[in-house]
């Protein structure tokens, strides 16, 4: 065996040692020591391969790529993303929300202790100037800090910005380390469950407007969950960690979740079995009757409050015409520590998962490639929006500002919100576009036509569907009062023509549209629009 082959094997073995230490959450000093050994071996391998060592000044080449979990977007990709952002923004503004902006990094103490087990995913920055800072993990905690710091008593706000997480990236399915979130939140004292139901209504409007396909919004209540844990016998100090385990039921089978509860978190097996009886329940408003029929559970004041809230929610959901999109799912836990009331999560339904995507492995875990990276082909898109009520987060910051005493009318501002994962939505939209081919198809031509119209200063929209129904597009024109349509079909693609159709007025002889050359499309439209 050559020296290079030996070094490669040593690097591979040492990499396994480092990964195992990290998985075991070993002491940082022990991990750092083994990382030094790994880096030393890698330097030896570079030198043996005829490359300069990593610290050598003679190094003339470097890896020209973006960091893991990030990516560049082309102009064409950005046109699709901009459409997604504008669609989401228009729904937010329609509901009366105003936009704000917050720093991309916060004081570390602002973010610490708000995310449960996910706190390990926060990016910490090196100390510069005496302040310990971290990149924001989400937009919710900075918003709560903003409300507390500025003494705001009520606001309906939205924010579209990047957040950062040290996650295992799976970029083809929308899991990244740098990504956009679109948040909509309502802060203030209002009648119970009205803002909560509106947030779910906003989610339905956004997802239907973006045409992501079939989806369901799972809902649950943290007070009901906490009551389940209490009556099942979960110790107070384990409730949040057990809640985080339950939150994995959308990815793992019950047997694996139970194993985590008992073997990793030290929960008694009989307690875990009791939890399992509850968290596998799901349905709609009829599930409330089942819960009311459980005397042990309903003896808890938390359960009574949670059931009363959910009863109100279903009443308002019916009025908002969103009942068909909602599923009451007792396994939904949302691992973040700041939730206090209703919680919800929008997911694609099973029939909407592309058949080309691999399903999770038998254990529910994702395959790991050699080198410790997640095999992206084993990852599905997952949730595309999530949120809930967080009534105590603003008060936590207000109390800290007053030295631990929360006083004043704005000290504890109730809040509820929803956050949309743009990268995952973008993955869905892009997955519906066929793979690029040498021969232009109708979808690609539609994208090019839309781009040409925008470049010419003509407002335009197009459907994201690969095979859209013509009548549904006509209906959209009627509903949104769009006066003109550019039509393309297989014949038009082949001949290099388009059809221009007046959608506002029926013109005799032009019922099916007027055929013009692609090269004349802009001038013809400008003439007809009087531009």
Place the predicted regions along the sequence by residue.
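Retroelement reverse transcriptase polymerase core
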Residues: 208, 227, 233-237
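Positively charged, Gly/Ser-enriched RNA/tRNA-binding surfaces
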Residues: 80-95, 106-109, 139-151, 155, ...
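Glycine-rich, mobile lid/loop segments that gate access to catalytic sites or pores
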Residues: 217-228
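Acidic, His- and aromatic-enriched active-site or binding-groove loops in soluble protein domains
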Residues: 120-128, 233-262, 348-352
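Auxiliary tRNA-acceptor-end handling modules of aminoacyl-tRNA synthetases
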Residues: 8-80, 126, 235, 251, ...
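Short, charge/polar-rich alpha-helical segments
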Residues: 1-8
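TRNA-binding/sensing appendages of the translation machinery
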Residues: 47-144, 149, 177-180, 192, ...
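Accessory terminal regions of nucleic-acid processing enzymes
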Residues: 4, 59-60, 479-484
């Amino acid at each position: 065996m050559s020296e290079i082959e030996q070094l490669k094997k040593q690097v591979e073995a040492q990499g396994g040692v480092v990964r195992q230490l990290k998985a075991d959450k070993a002491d940082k000093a022990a991990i750092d020591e083994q990382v030094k050994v790994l880096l030393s071996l890698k330097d030896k391998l570079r030198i043996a391969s005829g490359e300069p060592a990593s610290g050598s000044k003679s190094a003339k080449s470097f890896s020209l790529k973006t960091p893991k979990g990030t990516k560049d977007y082309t102009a064409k990709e950005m046109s699709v993303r901009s459409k997604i952002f504008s669609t989401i923004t228009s729904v937010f503004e329609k509901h009366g929300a105003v936009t704000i902006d917050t720093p991309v990094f916060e004081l570390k103490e602002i973010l610490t202790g708000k995310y449960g087990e996910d706190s390990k995913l926060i990016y910490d920055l090196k100390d510069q100037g005496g302040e310990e800072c971290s990149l924001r993990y989400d937009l919710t905690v900075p918003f709560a800090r903003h409300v507390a710091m500025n003494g705001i008593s009520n606001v309906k706000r939205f924010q579209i910005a990047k957040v950062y997480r040290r996650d295992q990236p799976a970029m083809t399915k929308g899991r990244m380390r740098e990504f956009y979130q679109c948040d909509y939140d309502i802060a203030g004292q209002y009648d119970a469950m009205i803002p909560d139901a509106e947030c779910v209504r906003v989610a339905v409007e956004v997802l239907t407007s973006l045409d992501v396909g079939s989806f369901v919004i799972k809902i649950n209540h943290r007070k009901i969950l906490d009551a389940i844990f209490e009556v099942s016998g979960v110790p107070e100090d384990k409730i949040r960690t057990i809640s985080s385990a339950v939150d994995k039921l959308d990815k793992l089978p019950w047997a694996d979740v139970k194993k985590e509860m008992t073997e990793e978190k030290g929960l008694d097996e009989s307690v875990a079995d009791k939890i399992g009886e509850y968290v596998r329940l799901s349905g709609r408003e009829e599930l409330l009757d089942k819960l009311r029929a459980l005397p042990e559970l309903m003896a808890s004041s938390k359960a009574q409050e949670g059931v009363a809230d959910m009863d109100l929610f279903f009443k308002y959901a019916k009025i908002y015409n969103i009942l068909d999109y909602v599923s009451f799912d007792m396994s939904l836990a949302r691992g973040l520590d700041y939730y206090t009331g209703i919680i919800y999560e929008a997911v694609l339904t099973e029939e909407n998962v592309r058949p080309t995507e691999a399903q999770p492995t038998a254990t529910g875990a994702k395959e790991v490639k050699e080198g410790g990276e997640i095999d992206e082909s084993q990852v599905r898109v997952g949730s595309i929006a999530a949120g809930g009520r967080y009534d105590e987060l603003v008060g936590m910051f207000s109390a800290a500002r007053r030295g631990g005493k929360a006083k004043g009318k704005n000290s504890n501002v109730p809040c509820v919100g929803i956050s949309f994962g743009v990268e995952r939505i973008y993955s869905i939209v892009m997955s519906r576009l066929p793979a690029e081919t040498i021969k232009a198809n109708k979808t690609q031509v539609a994208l090019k036509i839309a781009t040409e119209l925008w470049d010419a200063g003509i407002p335009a929209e197009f459907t994201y569907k690969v095979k859209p129904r013509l009548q549904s597009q006509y209906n959209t024109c009627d509903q949104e009062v769009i006066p003109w349509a550019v039509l393309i079909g297989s014949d038009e693609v082949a001949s290099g023509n388009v059809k221009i159709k007046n959608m506002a007025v029926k013109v005799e002889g032009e019922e099916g549209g007027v055929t013009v050359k692609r090269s004349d499309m802009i001038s013809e439209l400008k003439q007809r629009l009087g531009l």
